[in-house]
């Protein structure tokens, strides 16, 4: 079968991976001061950080609408035997619901809820592409993805809590205390939603090293074909610390460690100073 894999712009895959696997992205919208912008088309994460740092209100995001999905599915379903679309987790956004409504008009379009975001979602996108290259049918690929999504480990540590505070996800007292005490929470995707699972204290570099060590040292069933370091702007050297710590505590080769940048959705909710390590289990 000639299968096309598509995904929401929230998957945080690099331009190189998108080109390698010929992935089509459906962009979410970013709302800034009441005006709508298309994610990574006419607004970038840097635009959002600059806006907030200059005293602007926190930006928000909105799901891809049904009509936008329908246009993409109409074009691609006519050119391919099947289209598999992976959305950001359904508990984070209405994208899955909207994509499912749009896909109802096209019998060869399949929609999968990643139950994840960022490169947690991206892992499954790449997985779908690899399975298609192996010759599996669309139905077989979707079944495999639904089975594998619980094996994705996705988490981040955050240097700044002001974005969470402005978004109502932590109090101003907690945000101030985190800044004064240099506390970096670890936020993980658990059962399709985000939860604080740990916290670290100290410089960002030291917290990154401890965080990566903690999530890898006890894992005995990590897949070694792909791991992501996904981040917003972080202090110089932090990504390299994450990379070296990954190699120290797991047997990843350099070519299987992928560095990617966060999209506007993560930028809106987490801000700069966010770094995550995301992998799959066997």
Show where each model-derived region lies.
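Mixed-charge interfacial surface used for oligomerization/domain docking
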Residues: 4, 10-24, 28-31, 35, ...
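Short beta->alpha junction loops
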Residues: 63, 114-115
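Short active-site oxyanion
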Residues: 1-5, 81
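Class I S-adenosyl-L-methionine
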Residues: 36-108
């Amino acid at each position: 079968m000639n299968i096309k894999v598509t995904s929401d712009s929230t998957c945080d895959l690099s331009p190189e991976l998108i080109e390698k696997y010929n992935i089509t992205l459906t962009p979410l919208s970013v709302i800034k001061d009441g005006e709508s912008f298309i994610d990574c088309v006419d607004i970038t994460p840097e635009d959002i950080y600059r806006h907030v740092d200059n005293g602007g209100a926190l930006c928000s995001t909105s799901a891809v609408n049904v009509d936008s999905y329908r246009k993409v599915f109409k074009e691609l379903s006519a050119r391919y035997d099947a289209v598999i679309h992976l959305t950001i987790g359904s508990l984070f956004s209405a994208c899955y619901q909207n994509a499912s409504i749009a896909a109802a008009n096209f019998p060869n379009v399949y929609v999968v809820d990643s139950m994840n975001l960022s490169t947690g979602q991206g892992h499954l996108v790449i997985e779908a592409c690899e399975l298609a290259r192996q010759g599996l049918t669309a139905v077989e690929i979707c079944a495999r993805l639904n089975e594998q999504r619980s094996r994705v480990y996705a988490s981040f540590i955050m240097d700044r809590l002001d974005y969470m505070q402005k978004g109502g996800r932590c109090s101003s007292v907690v945000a101030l205390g985190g800044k004064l005490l240099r506390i970096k929470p670890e936020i993980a995707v658990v059962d399709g939603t985000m939860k604080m699972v740990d916290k670290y204290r100290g410089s960002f570099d030291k917290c990154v090293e401890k965080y990566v060590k903690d999530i890898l040292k006890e894992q005995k069933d990590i897949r070694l074909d792909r791991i992501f370091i996904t981040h917003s702007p972080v202090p110089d050297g932090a990504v390299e610390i994450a990379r070296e710590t990954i190699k120290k505590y797991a047997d990843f080769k350099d070519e299987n460690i992928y560095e990617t940048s966060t999209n506007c959705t993560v930028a809106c909710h987490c801000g700069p100073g966010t770094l995550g390590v995301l992998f799959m289990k066997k």
